[in-house]
């Protein structure tokens, strides 16, 4: 589950939340207190960390931590 832990680390740093709050079901806005700018900055940080690009239309569909994990698993080059 190293991927989740890497994603969790980025989220805790970007949103300044406790790691225990960052679960697969946690929604960025509702559960982690992010606003729309926070989410944009988080997506950018994840893109940089994992060397991927998340198009805007996909980013709009990412609402919780599990969505991020799935997107990165499906799109990260091995």
UniProtKB/Swiss-Prot annotation:
Listed under GO biological process in this entry are: lipid A biosynthetic process
Work out whether the entry's keyword set contains Lipid biosynthesis.
Answer: yes
Give the chief site where it resides: cytoplasm
* Pathway where it operates: Lipid metabolism; fatty acid biosynthesis
Concerning PTM, the database record says: 4'-phosphopantetheine is transferred from CoA to a specific serine of apo-ACP by AcpS. This modification is essential for activity because fatty acids are bound in thioester linkage to the sulfhydryl of the prosthetic group.
* Annotated coiled-coil segments of the chain: none
Q: Name one GO cellular component term.
A: membrane
Q: Which InterPro entries match?
A: ACP, ACP-like_sf, PP-bd_ACP, Ppantetheine_attach_site
Question: Which residues carry the post-translational modification O-(pantetheine 4'-phosphoryl)serine, per the record?
Answer: 36
Q: Where in the cell is it found?
A: Cytoplasm
What residue stretches are annotated with the Carrier domain?
1-76
Q: Which UniProt keywords apply?
A: Cytoplasm, Fatty acid biosynthesis, Fatty acid metabolism, Lipid biosynthesis, Lipid metabolism, Phosphopantetheine, Phosphoprotein
One GO molecular-function annotation for this sequence?
A: acyl carrier activity
What the entry lists under NCBIfam families is as follows: acyl_carrier, PRK00982.1-2, PRK00982.1-4, PRK00982.1-5
Q: Which family does it belong to?
A: Belongs to the acyl carrier protein (ACP) family.
Q: What is the stated purpose of this protein?
A: Carrier of the growing fatty acid chain in fatty acid biosynthesis.
Its name, as the record gives it, is Acyl carrier protein
Q: Which gene encodes it?
A: acpP
């Amino acid at each position: 589950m190293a991927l989740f832990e890497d994603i969790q680390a980025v989220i805790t740093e970007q949103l300044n939340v406790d790691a225990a709050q960052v679960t697969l079901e946690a929604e960025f806005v509702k559960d982690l207190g992010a606003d729309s700018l926070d989410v944009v900055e988080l997506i950018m940080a994840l893109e940089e960390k994992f060397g991927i690009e998340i198009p805007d239309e996909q980013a709009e569909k990412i609402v919780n931590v599990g969505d991020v994990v799935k997107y990165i698993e499906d799109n990260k080059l091995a």
